[in-house]
Amino acid sequence: MGTRYFLVGFLILLVLGFEVQGAHVPQQDEASSPALLTQVQESLLGYWDTAKAAAQKLYKKTYLPAVDEKIRDIYSKSTAAVTTYAGIITDQVFSVLSGKD
């Protein structure tokens, strides 16, 4: 499972790297700096959209219903356990603060 996350991260960085190499912006005068800021912002948003689309495509390609079901089961069991122990700790704190034995 760790290999899959490594592969996803590697592919996202690879896509971003190729996008950055392909977008060469020539230098402009300082008078047009708001336009430059807008171009940089649009470029970054474009990179983000490209990376997001690539990650979603990879997720859809590698989606395993059995793994998703296991994750949901583990989440529900762990939240139930945390809720139980949080209730126990809360009761203990209240009993200590109230001073009743």
From Swiss-Prot:
Family stated for the protein in its record: Belongs to the apolipoprotein C2 family.
Subcellular location(s) of the protein: Secreted
GO biological process, one term: positive regulation of very-low-density lipoprotein particle remodeling
Pfam families: Apo-CII (PF05355)
A GO CC term attached to the entry: intermediate-density lipoprotein particle
UniProt KW keywords: Chylomicron, Glycoprotein, HDL, LDL, Lipid degradation, Lipid metabolism, Lipid transport, Secreted, Sialic acid, Signal, Transport, VLDL
Protein name: Apolipoprotein C-II
Lineage: superkingdom: Eukaryota
GO MF, one annotated term: lipoprotein lipase activator activity
Positions of region (Lipid binding): 66-74
Species of origin: Bos taurus
Gene: APOC2
Chain spans, region Lipoprotein lipase cofactor: 78-101
Description of post-translational modifications: Proapolipoprotein C-II is synthesized as a sialic acid containing glycoprotein which is subsequently desialylated prior to its proteolytic processing. Proapolipoprotein C-II undergoes proteolytic cleavage of its N-terminal hexapeptide to generate apolipoprotein C-II. In bovine, proapolipoprotein C-II was found to be the minor form whereas apolipoprotein C-II was found to be the major form in plasma.
The keyword Transport appears for this protein: yes
Signal peptide stretch: 1-22
Role, per record: Component of chylomicrons, very low-density lipoproteins (VLDL), low-density lipoproteins (LDL), and high-density lipoproteins (HDL) in plasma. Plays an important role in lipoprotein metabolism as an activator of lipoprotein lipase. Both proapolipoprotein C-II and apolipoprotein C-II can activate lipoprotein lipase.
Major subcellular site: secreted
